[in-house]
């Protein structure tokens, strides 16, 4: 029983222990279930978070890929832009180089155009100077004939300088005329650097014709002295066309006129040109009293025409007294109404009209007789037929010599009242012949500027005038011209008389050529009294500034003869030599080409 009770007790204890273990197991199971549930929840939460993180990572990765793609695109775009900019940079560099070259070309073109403009300005000024030097024989510029705009320019120019048109009292045909010098000054283009400078002496002198007088005192150098001495070198064709046609008058038949072309100094070519130059209509008694001339010099065969044209334009501008004397003398010359005593009434022509023309036929060959027609557009009708001596008198001085010859003015006064020679004065002369055989304005301008003095006994060693020296250097040979056979001007020769200048003719405007008969009867000594060696300064000043006359009187002295070597010495003046003229010709040819 004890064993049963012991077994019962063991059994009870085992049951208690079993229930305790079961209860403990149940707790553990419950705890395990709760823990598992918790872990499952945590796992799910972790999975959700993992999914979120994974999604996030996926989004980040997609974003990264998108950004990488964008970066790649941007990189490509930047590369393309860089390439484009490089191309544009290269293109701009090429354009810069091209523009630089264009700028250089433009600069060169501007310089060239500036030089051309300067050359054109100088050429225009040269044309204006040539217009001042040109002859207007029979052709007068009228305001009504000029273009309208140019009329306004001329009127403004003349009003600006206080000038007016010539008065109708001078001549009805020239009441509306405009001096050539004014047209030249209007056409002249001034230097841009000197636009504000004052008027030059030459322009003031050109416009002095409205004042009526020149300022007294020594004259300033003319533009004609500087520029116009080589006018023919600029444009010989125009000068040859503008030059007045020469007329040949044989001594045996003074009514037969033939032209003389002085483009070559060979006598044979001259004669052939003379025979065909003028039509038969000119062969009439238009120049009954104009005398013959001499053979042309062949010393400078190719340069003689140029030297003649040079001296033709050595005095150019028309001034106040020139305008008045020119118009008055031309009115008197071409007036149809005065009787025959108009020119013969003066006592100064009593001896000139009594000249004998008998020796003329024996002294000069008929083929070389020639004189000049001052105005081809107007016909000469002299009231009476003057003698050879009077015919040689320039028409410009026929009215001047009617004035009292005893009035003598001081040198400075005469230099103020008289004016330098102009082309218009040369146009009114019959162009006596120099020893070089040229019936040309050269002879007159040479005598005008070279000869000055009233004493016939003086040698011509005072001739240091630049114009005279230039003329001597270009127009006279070393002795070839003076060695020709016929060296006598027929109008000077009188029957049985030795001719020279009369020292008593103190009021003669200028000493002309003073001829004296040589031993063989046809040698002519030409006396040109120099201003520096004249014993009468007053008369010398007057003579050197008045128009020259070719007058000889019978009361002459044979002691006044000069040999050809003495008559034409080589002066040491400041004029141009032949070499200098040729050099200038080459220079002007180069510039104008």
From Swiss-Prot:
InterPro entries: Tjap1/BEGAIN
Keyword Cytoplasm attributed: yes
Modified residue annotations for N-acetylmethionine: 1
Membrane topology classification: Peripheral membrane protein
GO annotation (BP), single: evoked excitatory postsynaptic potential
Phosphotyrosine: residues carrying this PTM: 137
Cellular localisation: Cytoplasm; Membrane
Superkingdom of source: Eukaryota
Keyword Transcription in record: no
Gene that this polypeptide is encoded by: BEGAIN
Coiled-coil residue windows: none
Residues carrying Asymmetric dimethylarginine: 381
Keyword set, alphabetical order: Acetylation, Cytoplasm, Membrane, Methylation, Phosphoprotein
A cellular-component GO term for this protein: cytoplasm
Subunit structure: Interacts with DLG4 and DLGAP1 and forms a ternary complex.
Region Disordered: start-end pairs: 499-593
Protein name, per record: Brain-enriched guanylate kinase-associated protein
Function: May sustain the structure of the postsynaptic density (PSD).
């Amino acid at each position: 029983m004890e064993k049963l009770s012991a077994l019962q007790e063991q059994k009870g204890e085992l049951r208690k222990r079993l229930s305790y273990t079961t209860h403990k197991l149940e707790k553990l199971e419950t705890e395990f279930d709760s823990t598992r549930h918790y872990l499952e929840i945590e796992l799910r939460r972790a999975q959700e978070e993992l999914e979120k993180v994974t999604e996030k990572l996926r989004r980040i990765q997609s974003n990264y890929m998108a950004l990488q793609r964008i970066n790649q695109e941007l990189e490509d775009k930047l590369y393309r832009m860089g390439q484009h900019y490089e191309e544009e940079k290269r293109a701009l560099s090429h354009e810069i180089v091209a523009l630089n070259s264009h700028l250089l070309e433009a600069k060169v073109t501007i310089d060239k155009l500036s030089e051309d403009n300067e050359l054109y300005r100088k050429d225009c000024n040269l044309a204006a100077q040539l217009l001042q030097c040109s002859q207007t024989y029979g052709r007068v510029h009228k305001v009504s004939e000029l273009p309208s705009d140019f009329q306004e320019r001329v009127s403004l120019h003349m009003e600006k300088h206080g000038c007016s048109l010539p008065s109708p009292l001078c001549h009805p045909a020239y009441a509306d005329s405009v001096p050539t010098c004014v047209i030249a000054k209007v056409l002249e283009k001034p230097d841009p650097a000197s636009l504000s400078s004052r008027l030059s002496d030459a322009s003031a002198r050109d416009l002095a014709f409205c004042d009526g007088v020149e300022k007294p005192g020594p004259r300033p150098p003319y533009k004609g002295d500087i520029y116009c001495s080589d006018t023919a070198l600029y444009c010989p064709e125009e000068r040859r066309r503008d030059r007045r046609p020469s007329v040949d008058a044989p001594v045996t038949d003074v009514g037969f006129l033939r032209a003389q072309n002085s483009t070559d100094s060979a006598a044979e070519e001259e004669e052939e040109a003379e025979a065909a130059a003028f039509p038969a209509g000119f062969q009439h008694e238009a120049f009954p009293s104009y005398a013959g001339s001499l053979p042309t010099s062949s010393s400078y065969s190719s340069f003689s025409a140029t030297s003649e044209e040079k001296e033709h334009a050595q005095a150019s501008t028309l001034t106040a007294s020139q305008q008045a004397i020119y118009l008055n003398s031309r009115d008197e010359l071409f007036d149809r109404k005065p009787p025959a005593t108009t020119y013969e009434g003066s006592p100064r022509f009593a001896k000139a009209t009594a000249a004998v023309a008998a020796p003329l036929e024996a002294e000069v060959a008929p083929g070389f007789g020639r004189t000049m027609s001052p105005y081809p557009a107007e016909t000469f009708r002299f009231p009476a037929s003057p003698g050879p001596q009077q015919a040689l008198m320039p028409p410009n001085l026929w009215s001047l010599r009617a004035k009292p010859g005893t009035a003598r003015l001081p040198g400075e006064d005469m230099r103020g009242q008289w004016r330098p020679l102009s082309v218009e004065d040369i146009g009114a002369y019959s162009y006596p012949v120099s020893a070089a055989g040229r019936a040309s304005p050269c002879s007159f301008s040479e005598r005008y500027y070279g000869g000055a003095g009233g004493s016939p006994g003086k040698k011509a060693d005072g001739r240091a005038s630049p114009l005279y020296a230039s003329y001597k250097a270009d127009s006279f040979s070393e002795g070839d011209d003076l060695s020709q056979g016929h060296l006598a001007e027929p109008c000077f020769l009188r029957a049985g008389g030795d001719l020279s200048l009369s020292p008593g003719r103190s009021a003669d405007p200028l000493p002309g050529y003073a001829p004296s008969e040589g031993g063989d009867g046809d040698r002519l000594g030409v006396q040109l009294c120099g201003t520096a060696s004249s014993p009468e300064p007053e008369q010398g000043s007057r003579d050197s500034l008045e128009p020259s006359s070719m007058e000889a009187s019978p009361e002459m002295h044979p002691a006044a003869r000069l040999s050809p070597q003495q008559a034409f010495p080589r002066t040491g003046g400041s004029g141009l030599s032949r070499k200098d003229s040729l050099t200038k010709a080459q220079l002007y040819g180069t510039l104008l080409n």
